[in-house]
């Protein structure tokens, strides 16, 4: 019946937490609010081991010498301070940060020499219960919109590791092209891969 169908649809929606509660996107040029900073810290700790290498073993969002990675006594504190000075897109539910994405402007590195002064997406974290629901795609779209408004004409770049299939699938859907691969950069069988957002005049 129609009633049964409506009940089934409602049940499906309520398996997606962010569709059942008040959620909103917040865009900032850095994090100063201590409550937001603490919520981001908790999210970083929760997602730490999802990254290769773990975030707690890194010293910045643009680190390239992975041989220097080691677990730090202060955990992710150094990494947290690094991202809080960057542009950020926050996904909040009921006023609590459940996902975030950060990016740098005027970014330059030798592995992206063909794309100088790009806007470089650095970190994306989504609370485990909120994954697989399209939030990552929304965050990418919001970052792209923010970049277009603040830095028109800048190319969008990012990197990940080759075994991160979930993110590479999203990047393909968003129209990003692989432009550099560093073989075994993060360990045997784990490459560092650089991407750039396609533009209309790209061939």
Spans of features found by a protein language model:
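Conserved GNAT acetyl-CoA-binding A-motif
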Residues: 148-160
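Short hydrophobic/aromatic beta-strand or adjacent loop that forms the aromatic wall/cage
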Residues: 190-194
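Cysteine-centered motifs
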Residues: 7, 14, 20-21
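Conserved acetyl-CoA-binding loop-helix of GNAT-fold acetyltransferases
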Residues: 126, 132-145, 169, 173
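Extreme N-terminal basic, low-complexity initiation segments
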Residues: 2-6
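Conserved active-site alpha-helix within GNAT-family acetyltransferase domains
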Residues: 162-181
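A short beta-loop-alpha structural element at the N-terminal edge
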Residues: 23-56
């Amino acid at each position: 019946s129609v009633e049964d169908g409506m009940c089934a649809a409602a049940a499906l929606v309520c398996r997606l937490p962010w569709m059942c509660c008040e959620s909103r996107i917040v865009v900032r040029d850095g994090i100063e609010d201590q409550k937001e900073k603490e919520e981001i810290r908790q999210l970083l700790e929760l997602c730490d081991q999802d990254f290769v290498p773990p975030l707690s073993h890194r010293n910045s969002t643009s680190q390239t010498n992975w041989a220097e990675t080691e677990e730090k006594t202060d955990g992710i504190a150094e990494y947290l301070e690094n991202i809080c000075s960057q542009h950020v897109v926050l996904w909040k539910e009921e006023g609590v940060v459940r996902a975030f994405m950060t990016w740098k402007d005027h970014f330059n590195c030798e592995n992206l020499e063909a794309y100088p002064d790009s806007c470089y997406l650095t970190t994306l974290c989504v609370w485990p219960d909120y994954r697989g629901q399209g939030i990552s795609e929304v965050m990418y779209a919001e970052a792209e919109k923010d970049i277009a408004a603040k830095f028109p004409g800048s190319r969008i770049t990012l990197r990940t590791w080759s075994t991160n299939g979930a993110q590479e699938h999203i990047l393909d859907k968003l129209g990003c092209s692989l432009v550099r691969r560093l073989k075994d950069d993060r360990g045997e069988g784990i490459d560092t891969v650089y991407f750039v957002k396609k533009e209309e005049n790209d061939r």
